[in-house]
């Protein structure tokens, strides 16, 4: 395809690798990594995308995040790092030309309070990913669950080429929504229930429905979160995700198992703070938060 758009993806974890693999054929793609060794490996080997029983190798161009000249060439940047890595990424984005639109696809809502640091003249898109993915190594990603990417314009506007690029394809559906708060709140709600429960229990998502006591606990957390973050058919939506991703471990469960820092402050803390403002008690959710923060403290992550 001629005149392909320069798309940069920042972050080469599970989501970054998955999005790079899917954008590689419809854009001139650069995947920006934290470590030079990973960029070198990706340039040599490409991305191995494992989907069910098939493995596909996709050749891509990778560069280290410190290569500012490469960043300034991009016509769209997709930010695929975890919430806690934004402290490192925001200062880099601040230096870039304001004409480059930025799409955030973080879990949680912690990143929303950072957007003002990018000014008011830049086009900013807020998105969520329904895909499940797991990174096996620096160049291999397993596509654990197919879903959609939903995005909304927070500020600014997109040109026609970018609108076309962000149009749905059957293999990798993308949907534009009018209200960014609605799509982020729904994903935040689901993550705030499933992630901490599976992380504390160390189980796959489906176990929250199979085990009667854990299912009661799930219902209790749903009822608590609903008091400060109401969404339609909340329990049904949470249970549907547990069912469709039954064999998957949530990202937070995997982080705890691998003794990594979690996104608990980006996912659960905003809900607890909302509860504090309205003097609403969220005892079960707060307990889950304290357990996970305590585990992080024990591991010094």
UniProtKB/Swiss-Prot annotation:
Substrate binds at residues 107, 191, 195, 205, 251. One of its GO terms (molecular function) is NADP binding. One of its GO terms (biological process) is pantothenate biosynthetic process. InterPro entries: 6-PGluconate_DH-like_C_sf, 6PGD_dom2, ApbA, Ketopantoate_reductase, KPA_reductase, KPR_N, NAD(P)-bd_dom_sf. Keywords: Cytoplasm, NADP, Oxidoreductase, Pantothenate biosynthesis. Pfam families: ApbA, ApbA_C. Pathway: Cofactor biosynthesis; (R)-pantothenate biosynthesis; (R)-pantoate from 3-methyl-2-oxobutanoate: step 2/2. GO terms for cellular component: cytoplasm. The active site is at 187 (proton donor). Its main location: cytoplasm. Its EC number is 1.1.1.169. Belongs to the ketopantoate reductase family. This is 2-dehydropantoate 2-reductase. It comes from Listeria innocua serovar 6a (strain ATCC BAA-680 / CLIP 11262).
